[in-house]
UniProtKB/Swiss-Prot annotation:
Superkingdom per UniProt: Viruses
Regulation: induction: Expressed in the late phase of the viral replicative cycle.
Species annotation: African swine fever virus (isolate Warthog/Namibia/Wart80/1980)
UniProtKB keywords: Late protein, Repeat
Family recorded in the similarity comment: Belongs to the asfivirus I196L family.
Protein name: Late protein I196L
Length: 196
């Protein structure tokens, strides 16, 4: 039984090899014929290069020089925006801060420790819906529509610290800014929780 199986297997392999070789020969004949028929349709490199040269020569009249109107517009825009440069002292995280602080610098120093969801009332219009995150409450207070009360109190507290005050004659270290930010954050969250 094993001998008959081996004989059948060898015959199958032999037939399979003959069939595969014949298919390979037939395929190579067709491939050779197809290649010989396509010799006349070869692409010469001069044809594409001539078309490219023609396209380049036709486009030479539309070259962009650096002195066109786009650069002039860019120069005028830059010169216009130079006057909008802010002259205040930038806030740094160092232990020492300059004595001459403008109101917007102090405001940004306090705002840097608060959340970005509070509206910048000195530079942008007020958004009536806002979300306040507080360190003591895990859930934010959403859709605070009592915007006028918040804005008024925030401005009053801010002007209290900005104006010359005997309690705070000058701000010289970073811890003062952090304490002020915590005070403002607590006041705002109390107002929100009471009025929402």
């Amino acid at each position: 039984m094993l001998f008959r199986y081996l004989v059948w297997l060898f015959r199958f392999i032999e037939v399979k090899n003959v069939a595969s070789i014949s298919l390979l020969v037939i395929g190579s004949i067709y491939l050779t014929t197809a290649i010989s028929n396509n010799i006349s349709t070869t692409i010469s490199p001069t044809t594409s290069s001539n078309s490219l040269t023609t396209a380049i020569s036709n486009n030479t009249s539309t070259t962009i020089s650096p002195t066109t109107t786009s650069s002039n517009y860019l120069t005028s825009a830059i010169s216009t925006n130079i006057s909008d440069k802010e002259e205040d002292t930038p806030f740094s995280t160092d232990k020492t801060v300059f004595d001459g602080l403008s109101p917007i610098t102090l405001y940004r120093a306090i705002r840097s420790t608060l959340n970005d969801t509070m509206t910048d009332i000195l530079t942008r219009p007020y958004r009536p819906t806002t979300v306040i995150f507080h360190s003591d409450t895990p859930q934010p207070v959403k859709n605070a529509t009592q915007g006028n009360i918040i804005k008024k109190t925030y401005r009053q507290v801010l002007t209290f610290f900005i104006q010359p005050n005997p309690l705070f004659p000058c701000f010289k270290n970073h811890e003062v800014f952090l304490n002020l930010a915590n005070i403002l954050n607590t006041i705002l969250c109390i107002i929100l929780i009471k009025n929402v």
